[in-house]
Amino acid sequence: TLPGREPAFGRRHPLTIIREQVESIFEAIGFEILQGPQVEDDYHNFEALNMPEDHPARDMQDTLYLDEPLRALDTERPGTLLRTHTSGMQIRYMENHRPPVRIISPGLVYRRDNPDLTHSPMFQQVEGLLVGENITMADLKGTLECFLKELFDNDTSVTLRPSYFPYT
């Protein structure tokens, strides 16, 4: 027989590299990194976040539900879904920890979207939560500026603009 060949080694995906950089930066400034389930229940994805029953994010056309409606709870809304954000990890963490809280929760999220240049039914997201005494919007701004300058370049200019996103 012929001698064996050296196995071809792949490369890490660019999004994996960026995610690791994001996690490393936040760890360096004292944040804990949380990983959580991609299959989520209605409570952690919507209810515990005070999203009302008629919130647009709960619609079947926006959320990828996985099971039949929960008849036992007398609702027509299914109870298991692919998470639409990583906020469920914040709820899980706060159920078992008291402030101060300094966490980020990166991960894949899913939404019923028609793929185009700016939309995908599956994408990466990072959410952060900082809770403690004397935390202000200045802390948010400083954290974001520190993160972006470390990720991109120290000369990166950061501008924050208030906006409204009906999904969130």
What is the predicted role of each segment?
Residues T1-T168:
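TRNA-recognition modules of translation machinery and tRNA-sensing kinases, especially anticodon-binding
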